[in-house]
Structure formats: C-alpha cells, structure tokens
C-alpha cells in the first residue's frame, strides 16, 4: 500500500483550489461558467446523471448463473460540472466508475467518480476549470496532473487503476471505489504518460505497458515498459515514433510489442493558439511499430507502413508457425474521430465511417516496410473486440465484439436518434466469431436498445477457450435507463439474465472482469 503517491493528491498539492493555482488570479476574475449542460453531447441519453451511491440487489429478469462470482468494473466519461467549452467532446468527461458485484445469483452496484485533481478542484470551485481535450493552454488554472481518469479501469496488485493515456494512473479501492491518489508504481514509472490499454500476460503475470508523448505534449517519444508480478519494473525501452500521433491501443505477443499509430497528429503551436490537440493527416500511412519484447533498444524498432486508415482497438496478436506476427484489430479507412478533421476541415460525416475486423501480417525479419491491405475476418461494421484473456499474447480461437447492423428493422432509428444525444459511438449488437470454424453468432438486444463493449467470463477455470458468459451494458431508449445483459456463449442470441438498473449510465469506454477465483485479479493461462 506504500505505492500510492499521496504527495501528488490534489487537495494536498493545491490547497484551496482556484485561489492557489495561479498566483494573483482570484476566482471572480475567471470568465463565467455555465450553470447547466448544453449541446448534443450532453443531451438525451448522454445527459449526465452524476450519480454516486450504492444499490443493493438489483432487479434480475431470468437467472444469473451462480458460478458467476466476481466484479465487473467499467468506466464512463461523465462531466461532473458543465464545461465552458461548447459541446465538449465525450472523451473529456470525468471518470465515473461502476462496480457490479456478483455473488450467489445476486448483483449489487457501486458508483463513484474518480477523485482526480480536476474533479476535486472543480468541485471546490463549483465550476469547470479544465479547458479543451488535452490542451493545457486552454485551462483556466494550472493543473499538475491533468487526467480525467475516464478510459479504462484495471486491477493490479490489490487495487484498481483508473486510466487516461495522457497521465499516470489513479489508484482506487476495489471494494469501496475510494480514490487513493496518483499512482507511480512506487517511484518506478518512467514516463509522463501511461496507456489506457495495458496488457496482462497470463503466463508471466506481467503487466505490459507504454506511454506515448512520453516526455510531454508534442513529443515523439514512446516509452515501453513492463512490471513483473512482484511490482518491479522489468523492461524499459525509449524509442521515437515517425510522427507525434495517437497510439490509443497496442498489442503484445510472446516476443514482440506492436504500436499502431492513428494518423491524428499533435502540434503544440496549434494548441497554444487554442486549437485542438489532434488533427487528422491524410498524407501519412498508418504506421505500425514492432519492437522485441525482451532486451531491446530503441533502435531495434521497425516502423511498417500500413495503408492509410484508423487503428482501432486490438483483439490480440500472436506469432504463427513462421514467426510472423498476426495482428487482429478494428481498422477503418477514414477518420473515426470525425470531430478532429484535417487542416482544411476535411473529414467524414458522423456515422459515415465503418470499421472492420482486420488481420495484419508483420514479419519483423523483413526490410519491406510498406504493407499490403489486411485481410478481413468478418463483414460486420465492428469495434471493441475482446478475447478469452487466458490466451492473451498467444493464438486465440474466439473473439467477441460490438457490431453496428444497419439492416432495416434491427434498430428503430426514428425512435432512438432523437433520444440518443451525440458524441459516443453506436453499436446495436454483439458477435462471437469462432476463428477455427468461421461460425458467427450474433446478439441483437432489440430495436430500441444499443450495446456497449462486452466482457468475457470463463464458465470455470477449467473451461475450454471461449466457453462461458458475456456481459454487456445496454442503453434502453424506451425506459431511458440502463440494463446489464448476461449471455451464454453456447447460444449468444438470447439473454440468460437481464439486470435492470434504476439509473441511466452513459455510454462508457472500457471495463474488465475480476473473478473471485483469480489470485491476482487475472485469470490463469489455459
């Protein structure tokens, strides 16, 4: 428990919020703050509820299998106070953590905001202070740790880590969801930034990590590092990327780490003028860096050049019999984050871009850096792929992912769209791909419901890969409340249980399952 950086805790570092943040500036000198939420990104289902509390024994339709015992943690970006930035992006909301605690066929909910420096100081000031997404030059006061802690929540050595890729993690209590403070791995964190997608090797029990813009905004520095099960840092490699681009997710195999760069580029001078941190660049490829996982130097990285496109979330990567890397991920041919267009304002319209499940083949021994088009594993418009984590970094047979099925009748768009609000991606179903047989099962929750990212839970520790349950949070636009569906992978098309929430939870980004049987919060390998 000595690994929490209490010296960086917001209240201790900054005293009485606004007045101490910028010498000579008093709260009354700040521009007026809005008193209510405005714009489509905080309308309809996206309107912040700002709920914190405990709900015991949630309503259940059907039966939750009693073998399901553990906790489903998820995080959503939800502004605690109205932003002074007009129609602030969904990504800039405060991290609000859900814990669904399962035991004996029952489930309880706990909901807490992460007490980041931003959250604490804005609560004290009773107004928004943080400016544009990842642009510190637009803040009303100076922040030491600018994180919103709103992207992912993972379990590590007895605590939760709330993650945002521009900052160090925040540590939380897994049972109470109390925030402990900024976490720097007992002084070992080498980078200013920490990925929102660390990978957990089920065999070595390592947490494999990286930070991009690792020396600050606009820097091309990447720091790759890993921590062993004893909490000690095991690998540290500094490397330089071809561009200062977004690296939201990455992949890990037994012997390599892989860094796909989204062609959204940062320019600090643009930021200083009040512009966005990110701007799409149609002139560059989608770089994919490959680095040996053990004993590497920065010069060992190879930057392959994939056809221009958007690197979405990674399902997994593994090495085949030839030693080639098979990288499986969501991939789009244009800018998924359309609200950050190119320098001329060019970009796709909302909902125009589709992402598909792509397989890239990477040969580290080859000097041929341009890559051909990937192969596509399914026809669905998809995102947020998940696997059975017991086979992570090795060849997998099953993938579960969100789909967006545009066929008539699947979703009642005439009813849903006026109630949806804006800013968050849409999916209206899930799919389960069996890579060995090519079979696909699909789950469609109904014409007035949308789905979030799913998680997979093994039926038991000895179950075959992909045999178990899938959980997914649903947005019910008829009742304007949330539901948690439990599905059996033997028949993904029907719910075995539907858990009804008396509150509305905004669309979230990521979540993870911690099973009661997991000794260190992560499953044993198959």
Curated annotation (Swiss-Prot):
Listed cofactors: Fe(2+)
Induction: Expression is induced ba resveratrol but is not dependent on light.
Positions of Fe cation binding: 197, 248, 313, 510
Binding-site residues for trans-resveratrol, renumbered to this chain: 133, 164, 383
The keyword Metal-binding is assigned to this record: yes
Signal peptide bounds: none
Listed Pfam families: RPE65
Cofactor note text: Binds 1 Fe(2+) ion per subunit.
Protein name as catalogued: Carotenoid cleavage oxygenase 1
Organism name: Neurospora crassa (strain ATCC 24698 / 74-OR23-1A / CBS 708.71 / DSM 1257 / FGSC 987)
UniProt gene name: cao-1
